[in-house]
Regions:
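C-terminal helical subdomain
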Residues: 55-58, 62-63, 79-117
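A short helix-coil junction within the Rossmann-fold of NAD(P)-dependent oxidoreductases
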Residues: 4-13
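Active-site-adjacent segment of SDR/Rossmann-fold oxidoreductases
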Residues: 8, 27, 48-58
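Active-site loop-to-helix junction immediately N-terminal to the catalytic Tyr of the SDR YXXXK motif
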Residues: 28-36, 48, 77
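Active-site helix of classical SDR
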Residues: 2, 38
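Short, flexible catalytic-loop segment of classical short-chain dehydrogenase/reductase
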Residues: 65-75
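Residue(s) in the substrate-gating loop at a strand-loop-helix junction
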Residues: 22
Length: 117
């Protein structure tokens, strides 16, 4: 999707790209090597898009949530669903990020539902 939109963003001289990555793109925890590696790769893609788009006014934010109360997290035993980040709260955060001026767009936005140790 980003590849398809890229030329139009460049032509417009501005644009915002938000990528939902994961906290697993910022640190390795547990034994899910493939999942973690894919999220680290996604962070690298975000950094490259940021670097390539900066001079054209394109801003990229990698949103990195921990546990979000979705079907993917349904089997998590270490945290009750009500303590996880709620999808609507993540959506509100993403909407707010779009209101920021280009000079204040964060590259990374870590969202923790619990204290990371």
């Amino acid at each position: 999707l980003t590849r398809a939109a890229w030329p139009a963003l460049v032509d417009s001289g501005r644009g915002r790209i938000q990528v939902l990555v994961s906290m697993s793109g910022k640190r390795s925890k547990g034994s899910l090597a493939g999942y973690t590696a894919s999220k680290f790769a996604l962070m690298g893609l975000c950094q490259t898009m940021r670097n390539e788009g900066w001079e054209n006014g394109i801003r990229v934010t990698a949103v990195c949530p921990g546990w979000v109360n979705t079907r993917m997290a349904a089997g998590v035993k270490t945290m009750p669903p009500e303590q996880m980040t709620q999808p609507e709260d993540l959506a509100s955060l993403c909407a707010h990020l779009l209101t920021l001026p280009s000079a204040a767009v964060p590259f990374e936005c870590a969202v923790n539902a619990s204290l990371e140790r």
